[in-house]
Swiss-Prot record:
Native source organism of the sequence: Picosynechococcus sp. (strain ATCC 27264 / PCC 7002 / PR-6)
Family label: Belongs to the LarC family.
InterPro entries membership: Ni_insertion
Disordered: annotated span: 70-91
UniProt key word Lipid biosynthesis: no
Hydrolase is among the record's keywords: no
PANTHER family: NICKEL INSERTION PROTEIN-RELATED, PYRIDINIUM-3,5-BISTHIOCARBOXYLIC ACID MONONUCLEOTIDE NICKEL INSERTION PROTEIN
Protein name per its UniProtKB record: Putative nickel insertion protein
Gene3D superfamilies per UniProt: mk0293 like domain, Transcriptional regulatory protein pf0864 domain like
NCBIfam families, A to Z: nickel pincer cofactor biosynthesis protein LarC
Molecular function as annotated in GO: lyase activity; nickel cation binding
Keyword tags: Nickel
């Protein structure tokens, strides 16, 4: 069975509401604090949770108490509340520093990957709004401690719950105005609009003239959600409620549906990016490919082609998840000479994957196993494991790989 989750956000979404729903769903508060402290921010905040009642419904409200002079942006939908982008948030951090903190924290692999993608997408949105690059944006909000807690904490919670796939409901627009570091802004604020545009998020008005979706909440949903839709088919196991701060005409709650789906042929929406280049040093193309792979592209490859005027060129193709399209396009525009990129949205069928370690006479090797339901279709030894042992022993790569495959239990393939 596959474990899925659905974010239902009738009154919007913010980072603290995500944390509240996850803790309400069973994620231990102390686990979150211990993992978050690996970012080196233990002296900057305290995290606590309380049970609250919102229009007769019990829910969990999370508070991020900053120990420096700053005001956390609770999701209170109030036009009098200062927006995420505070002028007095401390400390302010730029994107490269945030990335270094996350990469150096030793977080679970999915948590690191998700967190980096969320911050990158938010940086791209802010940079587009302010007419600069993601690395040059001075983040009042993204670099603040509370945003680190909200974003990385949400990723930790989803990983702890072992959520395989996340879906999200269409989002309410809200309305009115909000105070920000750049002055008074209309709601939805520009960064939220940009994030919605990047993912083509379906939105609607529920008639509430407050700020309902914050940049952090929008970045989390637009990066991690597979689709924005009505609730997917599932066997519902739990409903968890994360609370906002003030009362609204609707209960101020983010509802997290947690359930299971039977294992079926897995279909995944991907985007193929293509660009043709005939005026760039091959070394620069190689570097761009490395950056794309590091950013999370599913595959990157090049093909030699003949272009107009019979010039030899390169067709650079990138296959990536929908959530990473903007990131990969940013790399292509920054690192290559291309003036345009083609997008093709496709659906692919993929096998599920798991890893097992087997002991061979030469040492332990990890096997990647491709399966669907109870049937195993493919077993391959991990290249780097085989390479390391081959170099140590002087045996051929193929001989070591065959030893590993021989140790895989044959009855597991039936």
């Amino acid at each position: 069975m596959k474990k899925i989750a659905y974010l239902e956000c009738p009154t919007g979404i913010a980072g603290d509401m995500c944390l509240g729903a996850l803790i309400d769903g069973g994620v231990p508060l102390e686990y979150l604090k211990n993992q978050l402290n690996r970012l080196g921010i233990a002296a900057e905040y305290d995290l606590r949770a309380e049970t609250v009642i919102r229009q007769g419904q019990r829910a969990t409200k999370v508070f991020v108490d900053l120990k420096t002079k700053a005001t956390h942006h609770d999701h209170d939908h109030s036009q009098d509340q200062t927006h995420h982008h505070h002028a007095d948030h401390a400390p302010h951090r730029h994107l490269p520093e945030i990335q270094a903190m996350i990469k150096g924290a030793g977080l679970p692999e999915r948590v690191e990957r998700w967190s980096l993608a969320i911050f990158q997408n938010l940086a791209i949105a802010e940079a587009t709004v302010h007419g600069t690059t993601p690395e040059q944006v001075h983040f009042h909000e993204v670099g603040a401690t509370d945003a680190l807690v909200d974003i990385v904490g949400t990723c930790l919670g989803l990983d702890w719950l072992e959520i395989d796939e996340l879906y999200c409901a269409p989002m309410p627009t809200g309305g009115g105005t909000v105070k920000a570091a750049h002055g008074i802004l209309p709601v939805p604020v520009p960064a939220v609009l940009q994030l919605w545009q990047q993912r083509q998020v379906p939105v609607y008005s529920n008639g509430i003239e407050k700020e309902l979706v914050t940049p952090t909440g929008a970045a989390i949903a637009t990066t991690l959600a597979t689709d924005f839709c009505q609730p997917p088919a599932m066997t519902l196991a739990k409903i968890a409620l994360g609370s906002g701060t003030i009362d609204l005409p609707l209960p101020n709650l983010l509802r997290l549906w947690i359930g299971h789906q039977p294992e079926t042929p897995h279909l995944e929406t991907i985007v193929t990016l293509e660009t043709q280049i005939d005026d760039l040093n091959p070394q620069a193309i190689a570097y761009a490919c490395e950056k794309l792979q590091a950013a999370g592209a599913l595959d990157v490859f090049t093909q030699g082609i003949t272009m107009k005027k019979n010039r030899l060129g390169t067709l650079l193709t990138v296959i990536c998840p929908v959530a990473l399209v903007e990131i990969c396009e940013e790399i292509l525009f920054t690192e290559t000479s291309t003036l345009g990129i083609r997008r093709h949205t496709q659906t692919r069928s993929i096998l599920q994957r798991r890893f097992e370690t087997v002991a061979t006479p030469a040492g332990e090797i990890q096997l990647k196993i491709g399966y669907r339901g109870d049937k195993i279709y493919n077993v391959q030894p991990e290249y780097e494991d085989v390479k390391a042992i081959a170099q140590q022993t002087g045996q051929s790569w193929q001989a070591i790989a065959q030893q590993a495959l021989c140790q895989f239990p044959r009855d597991a393939e039936s």
